[in-house]
Amino acid sequence: MLTDILTGRLLALPDGPDAPLAPITRLPCPLGAVAPLAGRPGHWVAAAGTGFCRIDAAGRADWIARPEDDAPVPMRMNDGVADPHGRFWAGSMAHEATGKAGSLYRLDRDGRVTRVLRDVTIPNGPAFSADGAVMYLADSARGVVSRYPVDRASGDLGAPEPFVTLGSGSPDGMTTDVEGGLWTAVWGAGQVHRYRPDGSLDRVVDVPAGQPAGLCLGGPDGRTLLVTSAHIGLAAPGPLDGAVFAVRVDVPGAPAAPYRPAYRADAP
């Protein structure tokens, strides 16, 4: 699954490379990210509009919370992911990318939404270690990926430390693999980077598009790196800007973690 953020679309990848993306649903607002809802095939929790909603198998949305409704500038949700302990995390940003207007939110299993970080401009990720004890978060506008310790029971974050600072391009979507490596799309550089847990650069994958945006490790063995790209803002988009790419890699990723609500999460 992937989202086309600004059009509000949730899309499924086709079986063949020449087939079009299959539409699942379209919301009347930006759709930043989704995670599967545990025990409910075809149901999703989403970072959308100014907050969080559930999407049922018919594509209908049921809103959980809209924490950015009263922000001083127009806001939207951006990237997000479920952690290994069943919580869902997502960042917000200003429509015009106003500096430090964004936040990182955590949707707990009991349905409560907590703002856990402020003063972010364009949050991307987060990504988590396999045990959920480490979180990586990019602020794309600053070119920085930070690493946070996470209390696995509560989801509380400890003090951050710098992990990666890019000199060219901006860190965008991220994921981790089973060896603890961090993969990040590098917007503006036409690349994907893999970093070892110590922050050293391990691998660079060139992508035939200038703005790689989101990524995941999937396929039957978890060794297919899927990379989305965008053509927004390009004066002269190339033929593959906006395409989705697949690259075989050596280290697999883990299956996508679901959101595991501790309350009854029936979508309408």
What is the predicted role of each segment?
Residues G143, Y148, V164-P197:
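Loop/turn-rich, solvent-exposed surfaces of beta-rich toroidal or solenoidal domains
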Residues D56-V116:
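Hydrophobic alpha-helical segments and helix pairs
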Residues M1-I5, W44-T50, F88-T98, M135-A141, ...:
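Conserved beta-strand positions in repeat-built beta-propeller and related beta-rich domains
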Residues D15-G16, Y148-G155, R248-A254:
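Short loop/turn segments immediately following beta-strands, especially the blade-tip
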Residues G39-H43, A57, Y105-G111, H193-R203, ...:
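Flexible "stalk/tail and boundary" regions
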Residues P28-G49, D69-R87, V116-V134, T165-G181, ...:
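Beta-rich, blade/repeat-based domains predominating
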Residues R9-L11, G51, G102-Y105, V144-S146, ...:
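A short loop-to-beta-strand structural motif that recurs across blades of beta-propeller domains
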Residues A19-L27, D62-D70, R112-R118, A159-T165, ...:
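A short beta-strand motif characteristic of beta-propeller blades
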